[in-house]
Structure formats: C-alpha cells, structure tokens
Regions:
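A long amphipathic alpha-helix within ATP-dependent nucleotide-binding catalytic cores
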Residues: 203-231, 240-243, 249-251, 255-342
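Protein kinase-like catalytic core scaffold
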Residues: 162, 248, 347-349
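Short, flexible loop/turn elements at secondary-structure junctions
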Residues: 132, 166-168, 182, 217-219, ...
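Intrinsically disordered, low-structural-confidence terminal and linker regions
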Residues: 1-36
Length: 398
C-alpha cells in the first residue's frame, strides 16, 4: 500500500518590517491626455501640444514629470512660466554638473562619513548609537558585526528610543523608529504604534542592508512642531548654493508628516509639503499628493491645526546653520539640507548631493531654471573645466 503524498503547505511571504523600495507609477499617455482635456475644458490634441512644448523645452520634462508635477494645471502653477520647470532627468544632469568635485560624493552619500564630518566642525547632527557592519573583523563599542550582536543591542532598554536607517540609503527607505524592546514576546515596539518581530527585523537587515545599517537616538520635534503634527520630525528641505566661497539659500520647503508616516518624505502617501516664506519661515500654502491626487490643505489632517499663521520653528537658527554647513561643504556648491527643529535647537538630519527639485518646484509653484540660477550653473561649468585643467597640470608634473 502506497503512502499518500504529504501535501505541501506554502507559507505566504512575510511583508518586510521596513519599506525597502518605493512603488513607481507610470502613466499611460492616451488615457491621461483624455482625462486632462476633460477636466480642463480643452482637447487631447491641445494637451499633447502643451506637453510637447515642455518636453522639448529647457527643462526636458518627461511625461511622468508632466503628470506628477501637475504641469497641465495652470491654477496650481499660478502663472509661472512652465518652461523654467526642470524635469527629473535634467535635474540630475544639472546637479552633477554643479557638484563637479565627484571625489567628495563619498563623504555626502555615506551617512556615517557625513555625520562625522559635519559634527567635527561643530555643526548640530544626530550622533550614531551603533552600526551594523558585518564586513568588519574587529569589534568596537559602536560596530555590531554579527546577527547576535545586533540582537543583543536591540534588546537593551538603555539605548531607546531609536531611529534606524541604512548607512547608504536614500528617501527614508529602510528606516524605522523604535520605542522599546518587548523581550517577553521577542518583539520591538514602534514609535507611532505597532510591533514587529525581532527576528523578522534582523532578517530584513541581513538581506537588504549588508552594506551597513545605523542606529541613532530618536529625536523628538520642537514642541510647536509637535503640536502641529505629533511625535515625529518634520524637516525643512533647504537648498544652498555656494559661489566664490559665499553661500546663500536658494529654495526652502517644509516636509510635514501625516497619517501613519514617521518619515517626512513626500513620496509617502498622506505626507504634506509646505511653501514657506524664506525670510520669515511662515507657511504660505500646503499641498498633499502629486499629479491627479494633488490637493491643497488648510488644516493638518491628524491634529486639525490650521496652517494659517504657522511658521517653521527656529527658522532663523536653521538658516544660520544651513549657511555655515554650506561653507563647510563648499566643495559641493549645491546641497539639499534636511534640517529639523527640536527642543535643543535645529539639527541636520541629512545632506543630499543631488537634491530633487520636485519638492521645491512643486511647493513654490515656480521652476528653478530662472536667469540667476542658470548664470550660477554656467559659472560652475566653467569652474569644472578650470579644475580639470589644474588636475591634468598637476599630473603632468609627476
């Protein structure tokens, strides 16, 4: 008598404990042209012409840029010359040309290096509590080399609350805010609610972030900011330019977290983006979403606080810190600083060597390709050629 085959029970894959990738939305042109035409009392052909004029214009806007930035909506852009709006690809081309000292990219892209470098100059950063670094062969007080080291660290009450993120990540992917360990259930409690399994979290770090994962103290927001959006840090994206050694603030916007989001990145559904007055830090308007989902907001959806009359706390101090940080990083003439207001003063969370113009263009309803900025770009291209000439001359002398 043959034994019946044992049925195979397939276990569905477990969702990651952290967001390891963001979803990308590609828009089908024909349906989108028809939708835009119907909503704006025009024809699909006219929408095609409008898009083509921007696609072949100075900003080289892609179709996804056209929809995501809502460039079909003249009301959103409030009379702005849309030919000054830079598309995502041209955005990257411009920043790479401006920040021509590519030998400095490593300092900026590695969060350990950037935090250490800025703090050495006395700038306010968030210290590193521990670092998962499996490639190391020698232990230290900060470096966690093995899974068991990481497990023991995460079970320590004295290191919490914690914020974790990849050492070389971007857009807050892989980040998490943890309130405390729960040893009785082998879990970790998240700030903002919910729990995750410790072993599942370790699995995700091992699988996705073998290059390094760091932990920092969780920084609470300034009380005025907390009253607006709760126990999470909403950072200002401040873009600085440095020309002839002199820094200036180019653009600024306030990223406001909402819903279940602990991270303030605007791509996360529900988060808000505020246009602010650079002189005063006062909110001028707030938008959520992008493309067809974009909508203006007058109150925070969680707290109900009205945005009218609200200013970014510690704005004057933030500007001072941003300009000083730009002086320190003068080798990179354009940096997007993420800075948050806390009860202890403004703190630099990250610096971005290829800042995404989407945030500031969409918040301000104003393109970046204006005459003053293009003059700056031209000056940096000349500086890049001079730098290359000097390097070749130095090599020739060897």
């Amino acid at each position: 008598m043959q034994n019946s085959p044992v049925p195979v029970i397939e276990t569905p894959p477990q969702a990651p404990t952290v967001t390891v990738a963001r979803a990308h939305q590609d828009f089908g042109p024909l349906a989108v042209f028809q939708r835009i035409a119907a909503a704006h009392d025009t024809t699909p052909l006219q929408v095609v012409r409008d898009y083509a004029s921007l696609a072949f214009g100075p900003g080289r806007v892609s179709f996804n840029d056209y929809v995501r930035l809502r460039l079909f909506d003249r009301l959103h852009w409030n009379g702005c010359d849309l030919r000054t709006v830079a598309g995502q690809r041209h955005n990257r081309e411009l920043v790479v040309a401006i920040n021509y000292r590519h030998d400095w990219y490593g300092v900026v892209t590695d969060k350990i290096a950037s935090t250490s470098y800025l703090s050495a100059f006395g700038l306010p950063t968030i210290p590193v509590t521990a670092l998962y670094a499996p490639r190391l062969t020698r232990a230290s007080s900060l470096a966690l080399r093995a899974r068991d080291d990481l497990r023991k660290f995460l079970m320590r009450d004295d290191v919490y609350p914690l914020f974790g993120k990849p050492a070389e990540g971007f857009q807050s992917l892989g980040s998490i805010a943890l309130r405390r360990p729960l040893p009785e259930s082998d879990e970790l409690e998240k700030i903002g609610g919910g729990r995750i399994g410790l072993e599942a979290f370790l699995d995700d770090i091992m699988q996705h972030y073998a290059g390094g994962y760091l932990f920092q103290p969780f920084v609470a927001p300034h009380p005025q900011a907390a009253a607006l959006f709760g126990e999470r840090l909403g950072t200002a994206r401040i873009i600085t330019l440095v020309e002839d050694g002199v820094p200036r603030i180019f653009r600024a916007a306030w990223k406001i977290p909402s819903g279940e989001n602990l991270a303030d990145n605007y791509w996360r559904s529900g988060n808000l983006l505020a246009k602010i007055d650079i002189d005063t830090g006062e909110i001028e308007r707030v938008v959520s979403g992008a493309g067809f989902e974009a909508a203006f907001k007058t109150h925070h959806p969680d707290t109900g606080v009205c945005f009218a009359g609200v200013a970014l706390p510690q704005w004057e101090e933030m500007k001072v810190v941003a300009l000083e940080a730009a002086r320190v990083m003068h080798h990179m003439p354009m940096i997007g600083w993420d800075m948050g207001p806390t009860s202890a003063g403004p703190v630099i969370v990250e610096m971005n060597e290829t800042p995404d113009f989407f945030l500031n263009q969409f918040a301000d309803a104003r393109g970046v390709l204006e005459p003053d900025f293009m003059r700056f770009v031209a000056a940096q291209k000349r500086a890049a050629k001079d730098h290359e000439t000097r390097m070749k001359s130095d090599i020739a002398k060897l």
